[in-house]
Amino acid sequence: MKFSLPYVATFLGAFVAGAFAADPEASKDTTSQTVTLQFAVDYSIPHLPNVGPRDLAEVYNGEEFTIAYSFTNNEDKDISIVGVGGAFHDVKTGAIKSNLTASPIEAVTVTPGESGSFSHKVSLNLVPEEYILVPQLFIAFDNDLKLVQARGQRTEVKDVPISVFDPQLLLLEAILLATFAGLGYVAYNIWGKRYFEGTALVNKPKRGASPPVATAKSVDSDWLPEGHLRQKKTKKAN
C-alpha cells in the first residue's frame, strides 16, 4: 500500500500533537523502539565525525546540521520510510522538552535484507543547554504507518559566538556610527554653533610704537642765548 505525502503529513501532525500527551510515560523512554519491528536504524552527524554514540555533540542555534541515517530491513516484506521527526529530551528526567518538526519525505523503500541510507537537515532554536536527541523514522509497513525510534545522543545546544567581523554586526555598527554622527551634526548646528559664536575671543588692538626719546649727545648751539653759552664756558674754566 502506498501513502500519499498529504496523508503522511496529516499522520505526522496528529502524532506530534497527541502521541506523547496521551501516554506521558512514553516520553521518558529515550532508547526503546515504539513498535516491535525488525528494522535496524542508526545515524551519525557528518560535520562531527569524531562524535560517537556515547560522546557529547555540540550544535548551534540558528545553524542547520545534518542527520545521516543508515538502516537495514530485517523483515520479510518491503519497508518504506515516509517521514522523519524526533525530540529533544531532558537529560535527567527524559521528558520531552522540544519536538523536532515531523516532516514527510519522498518514500525510501527498502526490500527484505537490504540496507540503505539518507540524510535530513535539522535547524535549531532552543534554550542553550544539554539534551538527549532522539530521532524518529515513520515507516510504512504491512498496510500501516509505524514509528521507529532511534538511539539517544547527548547533545549540547549553544548560541553562535558573536564575532566582531560578523557582517551583520559590522552593518549594525556602521548604522549606529552614522546615526550618532548625524545627531552630533544637528546638535552642533542648533546649540554648539551659537555657543561658540557667543564666547569667541575679541582680539586686542596692537600697541603703537613708542615716541622717540630726546638725548643730549649732540646739541646745536646756534639757537642758545649768548649768556647761557658764556656761563657754560666759565664753568668749564673753573
Curated annotation (Swiss-Prot):
Lumenal-facing ranges: 22-169
Principal location class: endoplasmic reticulum
Alphabetized InterPro entries for the sequence: TRAP_alpha
GO CC annotations, alphabetized: endoplasmic reticulum membrane
Cytoplasmic face residues: 191-238
Pfam families associated with the record: TRAP_alpha
Keywords carried by this UniProt record: Endoplasmic reticulum, Membrane, Signal, Transmembrane, Transmembrane helix
Record's subcellular location: Endoplasmic reticulum membrane
Domain of life, per lineage: Eukaryota
Job of this protein: Is probably involved in a pathway contributing to genomic integrity.
Protein name: Increased recombination centers protein 22
Organism: Meyerozyma guilliermondii (strain ATCC 6260 / CBS 566 / DSM 6381 / JCM 1539 / NBRC 10279 / NRRL Y-324)
Organismal lineage: Eukaryota, Fungi, Dikarya, Ascomycota, Saccharomycotina
